[in-house]
């Protein structure tokens, strides 16, 4: 998702985007050989105050011959598009896609175009971006910035696809990552892109790939390239393109054979010091907001996975080659470690966000107002985070979902199946305590106000439920897919019920500050009052 401001190096100049739009995301791949469970995982934090917090099950369907599939716009790409009845919440009004996208009192979203429909489409889980389908195809996403072209508006003559709809078409039609990448590349070449530069992580039960794309200045086709993450390694992206050398005839890369010529024709082509055509340099893939907005998260995630790599926290510029595409973790990463990676605020480092003058009250790691603060992996504007797992030992593919920032929330497992009503049709502008997002929100807001005192209570509760849920998943491995999905829905109900009660327990701890000690990491100096 896109940032509101871009601070681009002096040679390019500073640009302030006028349009209100979404913030940013962090997304990772843990390959089979890098996972303690031997299971491929994809993670994605959906970081935007404007994000629709609903998670939707889209059922499998059969379609009559000659049917067309509508391709819809989305507000999360940049801003709302009233001319298309396209708004932030709900993200889509299209009852033909899923019951959860049926809002009879609202006007239907207007498509940008359409494509021939497949005879059969697979069931999948959907958010602002597609999550996972019934065959274990998994996606993650982050928006990137190209100083050449930061945004291409949707209009006649421009492409009809943004990454969100592109990923959904892949989930509807594909079983494997390679199949999905080739399909999405074909769609880009045929129908074109609009919006911003994007990364889509694409994985299946065996392997993970990174697909990066960028609209062209003409709105025809698009630049795109995909690279495989080697088995046994961990990958992270954080709002900046990560693929470097474009390597023809490399089986670990997939791209339009005309990509090198397209870059030259656009005047974008740039080579690295060895003379290789370089994707990051060709895209002029600068960071959003300010230096380290993206690179700090890349450094931290890679360093958490592989401390022995001793990667530098500081680099010379946005085009640094100090960080490898992926790393081999020092030890296989557990599910708990993957969850906690998305809770990280650089704790224990010289840039620990809980300490120093910029720290919030009660050592909060969050910053408000000016966007030039260090961007942590956890963030105050996270709407939800998912961790997908396609495990053959389970009855069906599953994912873990945390509403709001996971640092103040809990991950709950679900199958690729109909979800509880608590996860559908929530409105961020109207409090509704029957909805999971609002149940989480009341705990989140209270915790952030008294962070050092209350966050340990929340973290302990989250870890306990995550342990219980993991045991339940293992114990349910021999159930049918339908039984497994129901078991997880019932578990979600228990977690949400406890989370409602957790808010009351936190108020008891708070007790109007009487029993709360202020954290020494950020203790404001008192004014000296010694005389009248």
Enumerate the predicted regions with their spans.
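Accessory, solvent-exposed terminal regions and/or long lumenal/extracellular loops of proteins
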Residues: 294-371, 375-379, 461, 468, ...
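Substrate-recognition/cap regions that form aromatic- and gly/pro-loop-enriched pockets
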Residues: 354-481
């Amino acid at each position: 998702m896109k940032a509101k401001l871009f601070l681009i190096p002096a040679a390019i100049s500073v640009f302030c985007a006028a349009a209100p739009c979404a913030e940013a995301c962090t997304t990772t791949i843990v390959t089979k050989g890098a996972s303690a469970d031997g299971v491929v995982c994809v993670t994605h934090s959906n970081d935007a105050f404007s994000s629709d917090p609903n998670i939707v099950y889209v059922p499998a369907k059969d379609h009559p011959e000659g049917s067309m599939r509508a391709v819809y716009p989305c507000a999360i790409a940049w801003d709302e598009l009233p001319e298309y009845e396209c708004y932030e919440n709900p993200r889509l009004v299209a009852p033909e896609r899923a019951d959860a996208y049926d809002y009879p009192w609202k006007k239907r979203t207007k498509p940008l175009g359409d494509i021939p429909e497949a005879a059969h489409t697979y069931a999948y889980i959907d958010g602002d971006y597609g999550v996972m389908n019934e065959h274990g195809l998994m996606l993650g996403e982050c928006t990137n910035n190209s100083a050449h072209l930061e945004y291409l508006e949707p209009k006649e003559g421009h492409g009809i696809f943004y990454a969100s709809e592109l990923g959904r078409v892949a989930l509807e039609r594909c079983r494997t990552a390679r199949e999905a990448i080739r399909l999405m590349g074909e769609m880009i070449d045929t129908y074109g892109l609009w919006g911003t530069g994007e990364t889509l992580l694409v994985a299946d039960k065996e392997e993970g790939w990174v697909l990066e794309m960028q609209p062209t200045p003409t709105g025809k086709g698009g630049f795109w390239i995909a690279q495989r993450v080697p088995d046994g390694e961990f990958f992270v992206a954080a709002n900046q393109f990560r693929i470097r050398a474009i390597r023809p005839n490399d089986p670990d890369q997939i791209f339009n054979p005309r990509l090198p010529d397209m870059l030259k024709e656009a005047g974008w082509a740039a080579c690295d010091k060895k003379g290789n055509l370089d994707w990051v340099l060709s895209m002029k893939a600068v960071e959003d907001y300010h230096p380290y907005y993206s690179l700090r998260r890349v450094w931290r995630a890679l360093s958490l996975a592989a401390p022995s790599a001793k990667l530098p926290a500081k680099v010379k510029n946005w085009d640094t080659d100090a960080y490898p595409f992926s790393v081999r973790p020092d030890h296989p990463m557990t599910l708990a470690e993957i969850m906690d990676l998305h809770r990280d605020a650089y704790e224990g480092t010289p840039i620990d966000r809980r300490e120093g003058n910029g720290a919030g009250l009660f050592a909060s790691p969050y910053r408000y107002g000016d966007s030039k603060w260090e961007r942590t992996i956890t963030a105050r504007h996270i709407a939800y985070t998912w961790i997908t797992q396609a495990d053959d030992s389970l009855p069906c593919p599953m994912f873990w979902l945390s509403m709001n920032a996971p640092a103040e929330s809990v991950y709950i497992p679900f199958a690729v199946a109909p979800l509880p009503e608590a996860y559908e049709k929530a409105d961020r502008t109207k409090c509704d305590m029957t909805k999971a997002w609002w149940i989480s929100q009341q705990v989140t807001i209270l915790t952030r106000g008294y962070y050092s005192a209350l966050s340990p209570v929340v973290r302990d509760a989250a870890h306990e439920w995550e342990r219980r849920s993991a045991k339940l998943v293992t114990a349910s491995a021999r159930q049918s897919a339908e039984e497994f999905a129901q078991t997880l829905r019932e578990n979600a109900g228990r977690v949400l019920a406890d989370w409602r009660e957790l808010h009351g327990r936190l108020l008891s701890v708070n007790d109007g500050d009487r029993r709360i000690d202020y954290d020494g990491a950020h203790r404001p100096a008192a004014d000296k009052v010694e005389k009248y």
